């Protein structure tokens, strides 16, 4: 009996071929050297640059995808940025920007106060503002007469007007002439005279509204205006006569008993074409009201140094309270009145001798 090896071998080869798998050849690989690592950072020293300005933040960088080279995975590094406080090894050394430290804030200087000297002006006629009254006319019921005390260096005249306003060149214009026409009265020179409006020339205040009598109306229309005027004769034929005028503007307030009280608001001087507005100075006496000083010498010391006579007034509060030396020091240190603590806008120095005849 013979054994055939050819069939067995063929069967074995077929079984072997059945279990073999054919794979495609591997693709070619490209082996590249990895990129060198970046140089190490230099040692960093923590300096306190609190006063230095740091560089602005970096702009956003575009996204960079990683690449695979063979068996090595390489992630590209973003470019290195250095602030001004770090050295750049790929370029020149960048120094930090030095700035001067902020200076301490200083207080603003005190406002400069202007100091002026008072100008002496002779007033030929003066109506004492605290003596102006309204008296009832006994002969004409319901009518009131104007009275006051005045001083005059020359002869002149008074003009009494109800509800009048001041126009250019100190001209007084009545607003209701049909109700009360202005009345003019002459006077002679002399000090301390009392004027009383003649009976029958008064006015009936019932024609006016009480609210209109107690305050100035629009465009500075005052309920009561007293104009005192003197005319100085020229010394020669070529000279013109000079008109000096004092205007007293007042309001009328009614008391509970029905009587009227006069409150003077403003007094104006018109001398040789120049307009002056009279203001009372607080701290002066009646005798020294014109010059701003008390002739008796009492109560005239400066409120700051308490030794020198006070000769400087504070505007607009009109407190006569300092000497000229203290006023010069005060205007460099403060702008507050030492009496009422209101802001000072101007200082008025008044230098008058007791022997001066002009007031």
Swiss-Prot record:
Residues 23-35 have a biased composition (Pro residues). Residues 148-267 are annotated as: DAR2 domain. Gene3D superfamilies: Zinc/RING finger domain, C3HC4 (zinc finger) (3.30.40.10). Residues 1-35 are annotated as: Disordered. It catalyses: S-ubiquitinyl-[E2 ubiquitin-conjugating enzyme]-L-cysteine + [acceptor protein]-L-lysine = [E2 ubiquitin-conjugating enzyme]-L-cysteine + N(6)-ubiquitinyl-[acceptor protein]-L-lysine. Its EC number is 2.3.2.27. SMART domains: RING. GO terms for molecular function: ubiquitin protein ligase activity; ubiquitin-protein transferase activity; zinc ion binding. One of its GO terms (biological process) is protein ubiquitination. Keywords: Lipoprotein, Metal-binding, Myristate, Transferase, Ubl conjugation pathway, Zinc, Zinc-finger. It is an enzyme of class 2 (transferase). A lipid is attached at residue 2 (N-myristoyl glycine). A zinc finger (RING-type) spans 302-341. PROSITE patterns: ZF_RING_2. The keyword Zinc-finger applies. Pathway: Protein modification; protein ubiquitination. The keyword tRNA processing does not apply. Acts as an E3 ubiquitin-protein ligase, or as part of E3 complex, which accepts ubiquitin from specific E2 ubiquitin-conjugating enzymes and then transfers it to substrates (in vitro). The RING-type zinc finger domain mediates binding to an E2 ubiquitin-conjugating enzyme. Belongs to the RING-type zinc finger family. LOG2 subfamily. This is Probable E3 ubiquitin-protein ligase LUL4. It comes from Arabidopsis thaliana (Mouse-ear cress). The lineage of its organism: Eukaryota, Viridiplantae, Streptophyta, Embryophyta, Tracheophyta.
